[in-house]
């Protein structure tokens, strides 16, 4: 697995389906004891007035991580098939919840954000979710299970979020796909091809 690469499987389940999935024997066995965490994440996405970053295939956000810390994140364009996506993800710690454009080139981003004027970006929309996470050890892989519930807010518009993400922390994609197939054999689910960023952009229309 390449450094700074996010490999993620995004799924949609009913509340009943989610509860059933969490109680499956192989899921219970995979969950690390005491890995449960619950927190509120508030992420604001930014771009220039002419959407320069989006045109370059870049999503830029600033996140309040709910524990007194803040983080800027850059993600490249997301190619998704059957809910599985792979893309570059770069994270930069922040002292406060304000956009910082310097530092990403040193992390491996080909596009130089620092060439933009500091005040040239503005908030597009905000994603506010309650996130529950577990760490899974499955088929030699380490996988983070994230359950997000909340909404995307764009002015007076909003779109609800109720999704499940499996992010590959280490190991093979085959393990991630095998886990999906085992879940799908017992729980009704659908792949979510849209990222939160793409859904937020749709609200801007």
Language-model segments: which ranges?
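Phosphate-end processing signature that detects enzymes handling 5′-triphosphorylated RNA
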Residues: 1-205
């Amino acid at each position: 697995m390449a450094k700074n690469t996010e490999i993620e499987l995004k799924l949609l389940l009913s509340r009943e389906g989610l509860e059933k999935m969490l109680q499956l024997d192989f899921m219970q066995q995979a969950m690390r004891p005491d890995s449960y965490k619950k927190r509120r994440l508030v992420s604001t996405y930014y771009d220039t007035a002419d959407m320069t970053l989006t045109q370059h295939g870049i999503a830029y956000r600033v996140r309040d991580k709910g524990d007194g810390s803040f983080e800027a994140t850059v993600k490249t364009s997301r190619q998704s098939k059957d809910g599985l996506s792979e893309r570059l993800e770069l994270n930069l710690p922040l002292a406060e919840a304000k956009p910082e454009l310097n530092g990403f080139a040193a992390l491996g981003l080909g596009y130089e954000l620092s060439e933009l004027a500091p005040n040239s970006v503005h908030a597009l929309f905000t994603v506010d979710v309650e996130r529950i996470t577990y760490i899974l050890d499955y088929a030699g892989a380490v996988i983070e299970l994230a359950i997000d519930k909340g909404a995307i807010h764009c002015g007076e518009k909003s779109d609800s979020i109720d999704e499940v993400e499996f992010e590959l922390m280490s190991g093979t994609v085959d393990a991630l796909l095998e886990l999906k197939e085992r879940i799908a054999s017992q729980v009704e689910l659908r792949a979510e091809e849209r990222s939160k960023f793409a859904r937020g952009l749709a609200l801007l229309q």
